[in-house]
């Protein structure tokens, strides 16, 4: 079998490497990239040129993109699950991966962005995600076998991610969650941990090398109080040891990287230290500044207090991540999408309007960070692509 052990980001003792060398980088979320490919291949929709989007990302110096590598709603799972339709689904995935290879942009592939999709498709309740014998689990394992097996040899796949912010559902009492036994209880952390172990092991059976993360948000600052009370007590705020426990909940073996979206900056140093103690990598999968609609930075910070606040908050975030030595960060978001089939090419942050980056300070800030990493031997992406394409 072809050796793919040097492809993508690897994590050892909490350190990210690319092509055998320590790696640090700042990329973007391109949430709808596969959705746009499915629109084109399955539905014949040519309103949006996905290649143009990816080409402009490359021209903007973006090294990688976090992508929903699946479908969002259960009503679209049939595009892959029904065998007679799978060839078209593969064609759309092939298109995305080939474009990433062509323009030398790595993919953080989020396999099950919306955990409900496969449950809704087969009629399972959400607690059954931790049951290895449930119908939805078996279907997910088939998806892992198919997709991870198909693309493990591509240098465009930099990391596998299981989902998106599932931890925010844990111990919440206001979600209307009902178990498969008809019990009205919160969705529990133990379901999340069990689910990650099942999917993580399936990924590792096929790809023992690439970075593997759950895709979570930063822990709720009272997650331990919620955990101990099953959602009935909201105080006190987490201690350092409580945060350490939370990071372990969200990164059970064989996962090697903990994801934190929108972390409070006052806790970043602590999260970084805890990750090092646990020998896991830390990935800030989503962040953005204060939202202010100002396409192409038409108003300067001197002209607009709102623009100044947005730029100041964004730069403070990125500076904090860099000072804490975070290996990988991805800005939210390049291009937006209704999560159905309506293309909306406008975005409030690093968005696209016909492929034009709206907030230029974000592009420039990302380039500044990546240039720093490259100059200091922390991001030799050019060598990676030349060695592996």
What annotation goes with each model-predicted range?
Residues 380, 387-388:
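Fungal extracellular Ser/Thr-rich, low-complexity intrinsically disordered regions
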Residues 2-255, 261-271, 277-280, 287, ...:
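Active-site mouth of glycoside hydrolases
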């Amino acid at each position: 079998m072809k050796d793919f052990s040097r492809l993508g980001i690897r994590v050892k003792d909490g350190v990210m490497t690319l092509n055998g060398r320590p790696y640090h980088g700042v990329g973007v979320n391109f949430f709808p990239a596969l959705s746009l490919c499915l629109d084109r291949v399955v539905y014949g929709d040519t309103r949006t040129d996905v290649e143009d989007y990816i080409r402009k990302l490359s021209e903007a110096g973006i090294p990688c993109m976090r992508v929903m590598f699946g479908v969002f709603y259960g009503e679209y799972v049939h595009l892959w699950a029904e065998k007679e339709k799978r060839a078209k689904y593969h064609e759309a995935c092939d298109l995305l991966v080939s474009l990433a290879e062509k323009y030398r942009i790595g993919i953080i592939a989020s396999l099950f962005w919306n955990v409900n999709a496969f449950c809704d498709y087969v009629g399972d309740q959400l607690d059954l995600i931790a049951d290895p014998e449930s119908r939805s689990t078996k279907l997910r394992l088939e998806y892992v076998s198919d997709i991870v097996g198909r693309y493990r040899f591509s240098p465009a796949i930099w990391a596998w991610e299981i989902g998106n912010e599932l931890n925010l559902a844990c111990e919440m009492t206001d979600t209307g969650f009902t178990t498969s036994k008809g019990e009205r209880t919160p969705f529990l952390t133990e379901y999340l941990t069990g689910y990650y172990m099942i999917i993580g092991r399936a990924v590792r059976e096929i790809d023992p090398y690439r970075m593997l993360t759950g895709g979570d948000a930063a822990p709720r600052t009272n997650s331990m109080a919620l955990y101990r009370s099953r959602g009935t007590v909201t105080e006190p705020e987490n201690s350092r040891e409580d945060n350490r426990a939370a990071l372990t909940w969200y990164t059970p073996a064989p996962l090697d990287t903990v994801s934190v979206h929108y972390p409070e900056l006052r806790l970043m140093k602590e999260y970084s230290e805890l990750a090092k103690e646990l020998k896991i990598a830390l990935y800030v999968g989503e962040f953005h500044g204060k939202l202010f609609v100002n396409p192409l930075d038409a108003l300067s910070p001197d002209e607009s207090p709102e623009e100044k606040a947005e730029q100041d908050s964004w730069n403070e975030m990125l500076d904090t991540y860099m000072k804490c030595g975070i290996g990988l960060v991805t800005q939210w978001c390049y291009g937006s999408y209704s999560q159905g089939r309506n293309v909306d090419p406008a975005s409030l942050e690093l968005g696209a309007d016909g492929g034009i980056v709206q907030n230029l300070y974000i592009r420039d800030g990302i380039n500044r960070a990546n240039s720093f990493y490259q100059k200091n031997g922390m991001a030799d992406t050019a060598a990676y692509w030349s060695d592996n394409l």
